[in-house]
C-alpha cells in the first residue's frame, strides 16, 4: 500500500470500481495565488494516522489533515458517512465541467427547485427569477442555498434526476468511487452517502479551478438579479464558514482560504477547508460528523494548535 502525496499518487489507490479581530482569512487576488494543493493528492491506507503534536484525539467520526507531502492526521477516512451540504462541492464540480458560460442567464422554474424541508437554507428564489450560473454557484457555495443548487442542476441537465447521473459519473472519474449521490443539495436521504476520502478528492480537484477558489474565499456575497416582473432584487448572504464570516479569529501564523460546510441531523456538522501557513504551506482539513457547530470549530482549533512546530514559520 502506497501512502503520501504526489501528482500521480491517486493512480495507486486500490479503491474498487464502484471571536472577531485579526485577519480571519486571506483574500485570493490572482491566479498565481491559487496553487493551493492541486499538485499533490494524498494516498492513504485504511490505517489511522496521527503526526500532530501532543497526539490529540478528535470526537468527530471522520477527520483528515493533509499538506502537499503527506497526511498529518487521518481517522476513519473510508467509513461510509452522510455528506450533508458538502454535496454541493460535487454539484459545483459538475457545473464547472459541463457549463461553458458561467454568465448564462437562467430563468428559475419554481416548481422544479422547490425545497420542502422546513429548516433547509434557501435564497427564496421565485418562479421567473433570472440569475446567472455564476450567481447561483456563489449562492450554493457561500451560503449553501439549496434552491440555488437545485436551480444549477436544472439549468445544466434539465432536471435534478439527470444531473445526479452526471454527479456520480464525474465522481468516479475523480476517484471518489465510494460515494453515491441522489440529489444536488445534500438534504438527507439514506441512499445518499460518501466517505471523507472521497470528499477530500472532490475538494482537491475543485481547488484546481480559480473560480471555485474565488467563490469560497468570500466572507459574504451580494447578488443582484431581476424577478419575474423585471424588478431588481438585491440579496446579501454570509458565508457559512465562521472564519470567513468574521465570527472566529484564525490563530496567528495561518490564513483560511475557504471551503464548504454541511449540517443535517444525520450527518452532524461537517467541513472541508483549505488554509495555509505563513511559511506558504498549504493544508486541507476535513471533518465529518462533529456533534454540532461549536464542537466542529473547537476541533478545527485543535488542528491549528497541534500542527507540527515548523508549519507556520
Please identify what each model-predicted range represents.
Residues 1-3:
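Sec-dependent bacterial lipoprotein signal peptides
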Residues 6-11, 176-177, 188-193, 197-313:
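Domain-terminus/edge residues, biased toward the C-terminal soluble/receptor-binding domains
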Residues 9-197, 201, 206-207:
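Active-site-adjacent loops and short helices of periplasmic peptidoglycan-processing enzymes
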Amino acid at each position: 500500500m502506497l501512502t503520501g502525496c504526489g501528482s500521480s499518487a491517486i493512480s495507486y489507490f486500490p479503491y474498487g470500481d464502484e471571536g472577531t479581530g485579526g485577519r480571519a482569512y486571506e483574500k485570493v487576488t490572482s491566479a498565481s495565488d491559487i496553487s493551493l494543493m492541486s499538485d499533490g493528492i494524498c494516498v492513504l491506507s485504511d490505517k489511522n494516522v496521527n503526526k500532530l503534536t501532543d497526539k490529540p484525539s478528535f470526537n468527530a467520526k471522520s477527520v483528515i489533515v493533509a499538506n502537499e507531502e503527506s497526511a498529518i492526521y487521518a481517522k476513519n477516512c473510508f467509513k461510509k458517512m452522510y455528506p450533508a451540504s458538502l454535496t454541493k462541492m460535487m454539484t459545483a464540480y459538475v457545473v464547472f465541467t459541463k457549463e461553458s458560460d458561467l454568465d448564462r442567464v437562467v430563468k428559475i422554474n419554481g416548481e422544479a427547485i422547490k425545497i420542502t424541508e422546513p429548516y433547509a437554507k434557501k435564497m427564496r428564489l421565485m418562479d421567473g427569477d433570472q440569475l446567472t450560473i455564476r450567481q447561483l454557484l456563489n449562492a450554493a457555495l457561500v451560503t449553501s442555498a439549496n434552491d440555488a443548487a437545485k436551480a444549477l442542476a436544472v439549468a445544466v441537465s434539465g432536471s435534478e434526476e439527470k444531473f445526479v447521473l452526471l454527479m456520480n459519473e464525474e465522481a468516479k472519474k475523480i476517484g471518489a468511487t465510494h460515494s453515491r449521490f441522489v440529489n444536488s443539495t445534500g438534504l438527507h436521504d439514506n441512499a445518499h452517502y460518501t466517505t471523507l476520502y472521497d470528499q477530500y478528492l472532490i475538494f482537491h480537484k475543485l481547488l484546481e479551478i480559480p473560480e471555485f477558489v474565488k467563490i469560497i474565499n468570500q466572507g459574504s456575497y451580494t447578488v443582484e438579479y431581476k424577478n419575474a416582473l423585471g424588478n431588481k432584487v438585491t440579496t446579501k448572504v454570509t458565508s457559512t464558514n465562521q472564519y470567513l464570516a468574521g465570527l472566529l479569529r484564525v490563530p496567528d501564523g495561518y490564513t483560511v482560504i475557504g471551503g464548504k460546510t454541511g449540517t443535517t441531523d444525520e450527518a452532524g456538522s461537517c467541513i472541508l477547508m483549505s488554509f495555509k501557513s505563513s511559511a506558504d504551506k498549504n493544508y486541507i482539513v476535513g471533518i465529518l460528523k462533529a456533534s454540532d457547530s461549536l464542537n466542529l470549530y473547537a476541533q478545527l482549533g485543535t488542528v491549528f494548535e497541534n500542527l507540527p512546530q515548523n508549519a507556520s514559520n
